[in-house]
Amino acid sequence: FNQLVIIKNEEFIFNKIDIPSTTSNDKSTETVSEITGIAIPSMFELQIKNKLSIHETLINVMFEKILTTETVSQPIKPIKKKHNINKIDINLLTPEQLLYICNCWNAHKNGFLFKVYQITNYNWLTQDTLDKCIVRMTNLNITNESAFEYLVDIQDEKELLNRWLIGYIDCFDKNNNIIYEFKCVNELTKEHYLQLAFYMYIYENKKKTDTVMSYVLFNILTNEYYTVSCDPEKL
């Protein structure tokens, strides 16, 4: 962490939007900040590109079928199931449906299905709050050529010790040469900066041009914007 150069963009004034970080039912309480952090950029993608990449992928991998298939490791069944990926019309997308899609996407990425099974109330993000967050995203001037949930990976590097690293960049603005990591948290931590450094390491080692990239950590809830850089030899 100490190798990172972190610069705050003072043009973005701290201004907090309150969004619950948990959701509950009569069985459990689950943290949802990560889901919210996927949902807002995804809605922004839908607005500027008229597509929802994660929805398309979930349909292609038949995620709903995965949810209803018994496995030895995850034999849990959903408590209640109001939504279905295959039946959601993204042209009429509600915040509740958006959050369900993003919960499924998060499960698809990390391989853990328990939050899809356990979360039944997708009511923590109102349309009004979502709209306010989208305004903040718009202020970033992200172009419509950008890629969202952009898959990157790397292997065969000496320091990886035969490991294969895989991650999803929140947003890759190819026109502006900016890679974004978005958060929806009350306070940024070292881990958030290190996550962006992780993507920096992968991308800088894999890129085939001399293009200078900017790496930005943006906390949607607080409107905090930080540019992160590092000597490539120290990543």
Regions found by a protein language model. Name each.
Residues 191-221:
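Metal-dependent nuclease catalytic cores in nucleic-acid-processing enzymes
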Residues 140-144, 174-177, 204-212:
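Secondary-structure boundary elements
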Residues 164-166, 175-177, 223:
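Glycine-centered tight beta-turn/hairpin loop motif at sheet-sheet or coil-to-beta transitions
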Residues 214-235:
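Domain-level recognition of nuclease-like catalytic cores that cleave nucleotide substrates
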Residues 165, 188, 215:
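Catalytic phosphate/metal-binding cores of nucleic-acid and nucleotide-processing enzymes, i.e., regions
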Residues 1-168:
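Metal-dependent nuclease catalytic cores that hydrolyze phosphodiester bonds in DNA/RNA
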Residues 169-186:
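Conserved catalytic cores of phosphodiester-cleaving nucleases, focusing on short active-site segments
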Residues 187-190, 226-228:
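A generic structural signal for short coil/turn motifs at secondary-structure boundaries
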